[in-house]
């Protein structure tokens, strides 16, 4: 925003990015020490303050973004209505953002698992089927270390650690 760099978001999250509303989300399980670390880290970097955007560029699922690597936008609704993964076949990678995490910021648990602060946890789990079909080796989450055992194994692990609901 301050440097004139365009921000791209899925059309379903454009209003949220502009500050037009966000539903409250459940935190899920919490462990005190990881929670305090997360809050301390976030507070020290301005992460507890929201800065809204005046202008965003939007995309939809199935598009290829006009950036290096031409990533394919894959719908992953659940964390938010406009959550997406960006598949870059040339790199054998998929950027999943908060569709899943490999280090849960509120519990400290590691390995692929659902992300906290998710609007619709069941939709997020259902969206994993799209990720499973991508067949990329590298899964790059918004939180936690890169996962290099493939999308199918990441999804299997998430389902294994997620209680049936």
Task: Label the model's feature ranges.
Residues 71-77, 94-98:
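Active-site-proximal beta-strand elements of phosphoester/diester hydrolases
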Residues 102-112, 159-160:
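Active-site gating loops and adjacent loop-to-helix segments of metal-dependent hydrolytic enzymes
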Residues 14-74, 118-119, 123-136:
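Metallo-beta-lactamase
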Residues 11-13, 79-80, 98-99, 143-144:
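Active-site metal-binding loops of divalent metal-dependent hydrolases
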Residues 1-14:
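Active-site metal-binding motif and surrounding structural segment of the metallo-beta-lactamase
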Residues 67-69, 86-90:
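Active-site beta-strand termini and strand-to-loop segments that position acidic
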Residues 81-85:
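Short hydrophobic/aromatic beta-strand or adjacent loop that forms the aromatic wall/cage
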Residues 1-3, 87, 93, 123-165:
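Divalent-metal (often Zn2+) His-rich catalytic cores of metallo-beta-lactamase-fold enzymes
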């Amino acid at each position: 925003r301050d440097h004139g760099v365009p921000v791209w978001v899925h059309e379903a999250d454009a209003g949220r990015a502009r500050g037009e509303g966000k539903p409250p989300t459940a935190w899920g399980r919490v462990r005190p020490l990881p929670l305090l670390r997360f809050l301390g880290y976030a507070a020290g970097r301005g992460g507890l303050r929201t800065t809204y955007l005046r202008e965003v560029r939007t995309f939809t699922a199935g598009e290829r973004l006009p950036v290096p690597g031409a990533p394919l936008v894959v719908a992953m609704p659940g964390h938010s209505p406009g959550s997406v993964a960006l598949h870059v076949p040339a790199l054998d990678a998929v950027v999943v953002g908060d569709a899943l995490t490999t280090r849960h910021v509120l519990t400290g648990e590691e390995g692929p698992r659902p992300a906290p602060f998710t609007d619709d946890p069941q939709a997020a789990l259902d969206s994993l089927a799209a990720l499973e079909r991508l067949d990329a080796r590298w899964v790059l989450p918004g939180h936690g270390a890169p996962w290099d055992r493939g999308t199918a194994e990441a999804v299997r692990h998430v389902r294994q650690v997620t209680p049936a609901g």
